[in-house]
Amino acid sequence: MAQLDTLDLVVLVVLLVGSAAYFTKGTYWAVPKDPYAASGPAMNGGAKAGKSRDIIEKMEETGKNCVIFYGSQTGTAEDYASRLAKEGSQRFGLKTMVADLEDYDYENLDKFPEDKVAFFVMATYGEGEPTDNAVEFYQFISGEDVAFESGASADDKPLSSLKYVTFGLGNNTYEHYQAMVRNLDAALTKLGAQRIGDAGEGDDGAGTMEEDFLAWKEPMWTALSEAMNLQEREAVYEPVFSVTEDESLSPEDEAVYLGEPTKGHRDGTPSGPYSAHNPFIAPIVESRELFNVKDRNCLHMEISIAGSNLSYQTGDHIAIWPTNAGAEVDRFLQVFGLENKRHSVINIKGIDVTAKVPIPTPTTYDAAVRYYMEIAAPVSRQFVATLAAFAPDEETKAEIVRLGSDKDYFHEKISNQCFTIAQALQSVTSKPFSAVPFSLLIEGLNKLQPRYYSISSSSMVQKDKISITAVVESTRLPGAAHLVKGVTTNYLLALKQKQNGDPSPDPHGLTYTITGPRNKYDGIHVPVHVRHSNFKLPSDPSRPIIMVGPGTGVAPFRGFIQERAALAAKGENVGPTVLFFGCRRRDEDFMYADEFKTYQEQLGDKLQIITAFSRETSQKVYVQHRLREHSDLVSSLLKQKANFYVCGDAANMAREVNLVLGQIIAQQRGLPAERAEEMVKHMRSSGSYQEDVWS
């Protein structure tokens, strides 16, 4: 028998742990809820404090026969849930309600009435994990010993009365693609629930999420109509919200929200705990450009969280709450005929008691569009189609109908240009769509979402200050006449310009209300919160680490190296620390080059930085090529139980690195490719292979 080396032993241990996981169903290491994501009260509707957490009771009280649950991290799944609720109501007469999974308890789901239906719109987050708001529900429903009020066991098929529909949101560049919806579907089926139609799956990695959703929902509605004896009717717009102008109020009134995220912020008394529902208005204490070449800028910012009671750990994420650019706000208001009413005060209320108003109210049209609505996102075909009834003339209506019904035509005219809703309508006609109800715009557009960035500092070195590293997005798509500009990165660049003395910052021609609502962000402040990540250094600093981070993928690894240098300075035994970093040219976009030299001096031969410059030679060289060239080093460190980390592009780089690592293991150990692939998978499941990637 061949002698087992360290990596083989690690794999053997993982197999044993995996077996235990199978038989305990994760009881001892269930996915923890984000400790930084303290739940905040909903603005309207939902299961507020003091309200029932019994979904069946809630449906009976409000006369609903269809509940659409969502597990959402960035708002997309919530948006799809709202769209399904609206369509079910308008086309089929269903009495629908949208429900946040964390607002309810599920011990009585075995009493779900046979004449009702539940939808589950589930995003998969990170490495096959539930979104923050779905953690408790998922742990309950997928548990081996799931217990319902009736006391029935899984063998008794306790959910036999539950009819359900599922749609999953995922990204095929991640290993655990659609894990949530697939695992949920399996759990519900095991418990006897009856799925109606196919389990839908939308793929963000392939860029087909919207079309996947549209293709799935039509046969789903057919199946649901048959199962519940529904009759389709002509869909007529029925507002979910009432929007009324209030002439008794002006923007100067203290009761009016002008962009503040919460009542406390509006009243000038913000207080913690700060979370995804309640950001901290943090001062930016330093900002600079790491490089500025041609069409690209890269920012480094230091954000103070002193006095906020916010904390972070090295490897966590910071969320930046952006503001829409003034030019896009003006365009939107002009397209919908609201330019002259931008400062009119409006009240927004849910017509249905279960409707959750996504915007603080009262507010103004300008504030709603500038601070609360995702107006700069690519528009969906379905949303464009809903505007046909409100077109300014018949010719425009015919074009809108064609765009909404012809997938290829929409792709050619709208998707290829990455048009926002306002740009799409401007491409059809110069006439304003003044007849579109503002309620329809609130319903059809997502709430403006925070953007997450890998923290590029060590909490050990600077616990009250968070570093971020971000490339400013400004991209010209092939065939497009305009630049696609990142909402948040250009906002950050404007803040940097202002902080560094520019009296009128206008990155890529964009301007922002930098001082924020009622000048509350004056002095260069930005709303933030912190999100926990499992992307962490090993607890034993002597353990080797291999990091692969091209471009801004280097961000968390700056924090890792910063921390190891600090530990070494304290006399700790620090293990081999290897970074594979890639960029275009060493004299163009090699960020933190001087800083890394300092860390090299501090860590000596414990730190090795291996670079890949893709544009310096005729043959492009990427980090995966350097990884293969240093296969002996990689293999040696893996035998020493090294942790392996990847940060950056999921679609190409991360996939290639995963493939190359398997090839290195196979080559160095004389193993079949299939066995090496299994070893990489076991590294992932054990936590010794970690990714922080995006597409």
From Swiss-Prot:
The keyword Oxidoreductase applies. Pfam families: FAD_binding_1, Flavodoxin_1, NAD_binding_1. Gene3D superfamilies: 3.40.50.360, NADPH-cytochrome p450 Reductase, Chain A, domain 3, Nucleotide-binding domain of ferredoxin-NADP reductase (FNR) module, Translation factors. GO terms for molecular function: flavin adenine dinucleotide binding; FMN binding; NADP binding; NADPH-hemoprotein reductase activity. Residues 32-695 are cytoplasmic. Residues 277-538 form the FAD-binding FR-type domain. InterPro entries: CysJ-like_FAD-binding (IPR003097), FAD-bd_FR_type (IPR017927), Flavdoxin-like (IPR001094), Flavodoxin/NO_synth (IPR008254), Flavoprot_Pyr_Nucl_cyt_Rdtase (IPR001709), Flavoprotein-like_sf (IPR029039), FNR_nucleotide-bd (IPR039261), NADPH_Cyt_P450_Rdtase_alpha (IPR023173). Keywords: Cell membrane, Endoplasmic reticulum, FAD, Flavoprotein, FMN, Lipid biosynthesis, Lipid metabolism, Membrane, Mitochondrion, Mitochondrion outer membrane, NADP, Oxidoreductase, Steroid biosynthesis, Steroid metabolism, Sterol biosynthesis, Sterol metabolism, Transmembrane, Transmembrane helix. CDD domains: CYPOR. It is found in: Endoplasmic reticulum membrane; Mitochondrion outer membrane; Cell membrane. GO terms for cellular component: cytosol; endoplasmic reticulum membrane; mitochondrial outer membrane; plasma membrane. Residues 1-8 are lumenal. The chain crosses the membrane at residues 9-31. NADP(+) binds at R296, T552, S614, R615, K620, V621, Y622, V623, Q624, E656. Binds 1 FAD per monomer. Binds 1 FMN per monomer. GO terms for biological process: ergosterol biosynthetic process. It is a single-pass membrane protein. This enzyme is required for electron transfer from NADP to cytochrome P450 in microsomes. It can also provide electron transfer to heme oxygenase and cytochrome B5. Involved in ergosterol biosynthesis. Belongs to the NADPH--cytochrome P450 reductase family. In the N-terminal section; belongs to the flavodoxin family. This is NADPH--cytochrome P450 reductase. It comes from Aspergillus terreus (strain NIH 2624 / FGSC A1156). The lineage of its organism: Eukaryota, Fungi, Dikarya, Ascomycota, Pezizomycotina.
